Curated annotation (Swiss-Prot):
Its cofactor is Mg(2+). Its EC number is 2.7.7.72. Belongs to the tRNA nucleotidyltransferase/poly(A) polymerase family. Bacterial CCA-adding enzyme type 3 subfamily. The lineage of its organism: Bacteria, Bacillati, Bacillota, Bacilli, Lactobacillales. Catalyzes the addition and repair of the essential 3'-terminal CCA sequence in tRNAs without using a nucleic acid template. Adds these three nucleotides in the order of C, C, and A to the tRNA nucleotide-73, using CTP and ATP as substrates and producing inorganic pyrophosphate. tRNA 3'-terminal CCA addition is required both for tRNA processing and repair. Also involved in tRNA surveillance by mediating tandem CCA addition to generate a CCACCA at the 3' terminus of unstable tRNAs. While stable tRNAs receive only 3'-terminal CCA, unstable tRNAs are marked with CCACCA and rapidly degraded. It holds the Pfam family tRNA_NucTran2_2. Keywords: ATP-binding, Magnesium, Metal-binding, Nucleotide-binding, Nucleotidyltransferase, RNA repair, RNA-binding, Transferase, tRNA processing. CTP binds at G32, R35, R116, D159, R162, R165, R168. This is CCA-adding enzyme.
Length: 396
């Protein structure tokens, strides 16, 4: 055990531990919040583990919510904040390689910590600021390594998503994989196929947006994890570019666009790929637009109206994508051209469909064609953005 200075987020939660202890129970801060305290990383909330059973937690606090009571978790509302409190437990029988078939509540913190994924996440801290470290998590923090608790293969058979969490933590923390843990991922990477795509995607995106994604991507590819991901099997050579980026992506849509370009997805294959990863329709659409913009800009054939249709957000994203791929596209020139456009949105056009109808144009395909012609004329600088000038330009 060692001592650590307790910061504000823990100080605010301290009365919760005190109240549990006053009721005769043990209570500790556990997991990632303790790890991040020691690494001096931002902490947004804390997790609390206790010897109290869920019903005893509910009896101890006036306000609570049964957020995961079957697995021992109760959310209590106290002092204007909410806290997840979980009973010490053991788990067994992971037939789906993700969730335990059986959860057993125990009265011993040691047993609870044994079920956790990595040594750096198996740390606990009591109300006095003492760190309880059964697996040399403190040493692994100093060595900056991701190491499984106990036998790595057992941990990954319990929850195969932990393999993706390992490489995600590499990226976020700038840590390396402990060799036995790495070998266990190589031996068991096929188990990732048992995990829902949504959960894999969440870890994949966090990996990509982490501060040290290059090394994490090296192990993502080398351990075989990429082979179990939608659309990435057999693509190690193309994806190896991810291991050489000077800086990783800082935007999720740009990241997916980068993947689409690296694996040479034709335009009509982007949507199926994005759907296979269970991405939202909005993300799907944005990625298709970014890749299309990147392809157009790469050819150097873009008109002012093309820039107008691309729009500022997708233009900036396409330029980021070009930078990641080592294909600088005169970014400032293109942005300056965009900023000089007379209008940036169709709603800024001096006329609309109702105005054309008042001018005698019947609702018809012709009306849409005239609006398009007016928009192109204004954007390209052929005509001033005024009703009179547009009327003359359209000869109506």
């Amino acid at each position: 055990m060692t001592n650590i200075r307790i910061t504000e987020v823990f100080t605010q939660a301290m009365p919760v531990l005190e109240k549990l202890e006053e009721a005769g129970f043990e209570a500790y801060f556990v997991g990632g919040c303790v790890r991040d305290l020691l690494l001096e990383r931002p902490i947004h909330d804390v997790d609390i583990a206790t010897s109290a059973y869920p019903e005893e937690v509910k009896e101890t606090f006036a306000k609570s919510i049964d957020t995961g009571i079957l697995h021992g978790t109760v959310t209590v509302l106290y002092g204007g904040s909410s806290y997840e409190i979980t009973t010490f437990r053991t788990e067994s029988g992971y037939q789906d390689f993700r969730r335990p078939d059986k959860v057993t509540f125990v009265q011993n913190l040691d047993e609870d910590l044994k079920r956790r994924d990595f040594t750096i996440n198996a740390l606990a801290m009591n109300r006095q600021g003492e760190i309880i470290d059964l697996f040399d998590g403190l040493g692994d923090l100093k060595r900056r390594v991701i190491k499984a608790v106990g036998v790595a293969e057992d941990r990954f058979h319990e929850d195969a998503l932990r393999m993706m969490r390992a490489v995600r933590f590499m990226s976020q923390l700038s840590f390396s994989l402990e060799e036995k843990t790495r070998q266990a991922i190589i031996n068991n990477h096929e188990l990732l196929s048992k995990i829902s795509v949504e959960r894999i995607r969440e870890e994949f995106v966090k990996l990509a947006l982490g501060k040290d994604s290059r090394q994490a991507f090296k192990d993502f590819l080398a351990t075989g994890l990429s082979e179990e991901c939608p659309g990435l099997a057999g693509k190690k050579d193309q994806l190896s570019v991810l291991t050489d980026l000077k800086a990783g992506p800082d935007d999720e849509a740009v990241f997916w666009s980068l993947i689409a370009v690296l694996i040479n997805l034709p335009a009509d294959k982007i949507s199926p790929f994005m759907r296979a990863w269970k991405n939202s329709n909005a993300m799907n659409q944005q990625v298709r637009q970014i890749v299309a913009a990147f392809d157009l800009l790469s050819r150097g054939e873009e008109s002012d109206f093309d820039l107008f249709e691309i729009g500022q957000e997708n233009l900036e994203a396409a330029l980021k994508l070009a930078g990641l791929l080592g294909k600088p596209l005169s970014s400032q020139v293109l942005l300056d051209r965009y900023n000089r456009l007379p209008i940036k949105a169709a709603g800024e056009l001096a006329i609309d469909g109702q105005w054309l109808i008042k001018e005698g144009i019947k609702p018809s395909p012709e009306l849409g064609q005239l609006l398009r012609k007016a928009l192109e004329g204004v954007v390209s600088g052929q005509v001033e953005n005024s009703q009179a000038a547009i009327a003359e330009f359209l000869a109506i």
